Amino acid sequence: MRLSDMNGKEIIDLKKGERMGILGQADLEIDENTGHIKAFLIPTLKWFGFKKNGTEVRVPWRNIKKIGSDMIIIDFNDFSD
């Protein structure tokens, strides 16, 4: 799967069923030595959709449980970082 294939997918919290954002608004953290994806960096949004400077949620790759056709399911309760 290419990164462009994941753009626009909704990010859903597995336990709460909450919508956390759209991946097109997120960044990836990549290990420079291996080239592997380490985490998604998802900006948190303020009222009216304006970004809050410097605020983001780091989602380790191991917490991505499923990438479907229109959403990505993440286990936010399983973070050990």
Segments (PLM) and residue ranges:
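Peripheral interaction segments used for macromolecular assembly
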Residues: 1-81
